[in-house]
Amino acid sequence: MLRNAVLLLGIVASGATNRNPTISVAPSLAVDERMIGRWDITIATPDGEKPSWLEIEHSGRDQMVGRFVGVFGSARPISVIVVNGDSLSFSIPYQWENGNGNLSVRGAAQGGALAGAMTFPDGKTYSWTAVRAPRLDGRPTPAWGAPIRLLHANDLGGWHSSGTTNQWTVVNGLLSSPRSGSNLVTDRKFGDFKLHVEFRYPKESNSGVYLRGRHEVQIQDDFGNPPANDRFSGVYGFISPSVIAARPAGQWQTYDITLIGRMVTVVANGKQVICNQEIPGITGGALDSHEGEPGPLFLQGDHGPVDYRNIVITPAR
């Protein structure tokens, strides 16, 4: 329809005697295919390595756009990625970082990888490297192994705290974090799995279950709210649930999650809210960006009180 309209305008403008109107279209410029795709980033900081994630896409004739996930926070759109030969750069507004400046990224292609420097909103600059994210697609449904109960009756065996202090306790199989503090991480790592978890939170509290330590399924007091990718049962910053199936705060609730490669299905309180959708990359707060490797389960404990019970994981054989 648009092309026909343009042709008609050309005919009218050139006069009836011009029986062969032409349309001028700017030529496409070459796009460096080495940049396009998803990248797992590792940032070198004085406090150790920190994970991030970058997606670069070709838009239109010669533009690059994308998404970025920082050390924490949700996926942010990148309206323009400047590519000049082997180099790239972009700048985006701050989100949850310290400081009020932009987050600015500079980098260059180095063989099959990327490397560069990242300046945070507080003005501090760190070096980073990135490898192409593994696809992890096309996997058949695996044969499942035996279910593993991850909680002991009265101790934290099989788990460790991510911080210097630990506020988590287990009494009679009830795992509790009475206040904001450290996250809790399984000692064991998993690849593909099915997970059953039961949880309870007080009003306005927040937690999350990180699959392989990299992909957060949000736990939050969202009873009565519309769906969003940062709300109850969403994959934080990436995938919105079809509905919010949350119960009122103070009640026990359940997730049944299946993760095969990047494909995730989430059943919240008996209702399927995400059906075999792709998780594009790591979410903010991930332990690392090594997406091709098995990883632990971790429970977010730094956003308010929360209780868990009956955590059962069934790994693929």
Regions found by a protein language model. Give the residues of each.
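Bacterial Sec-dependent signal peptides at the C-terminal "C-region" and cleavage site
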Residues: 9-31
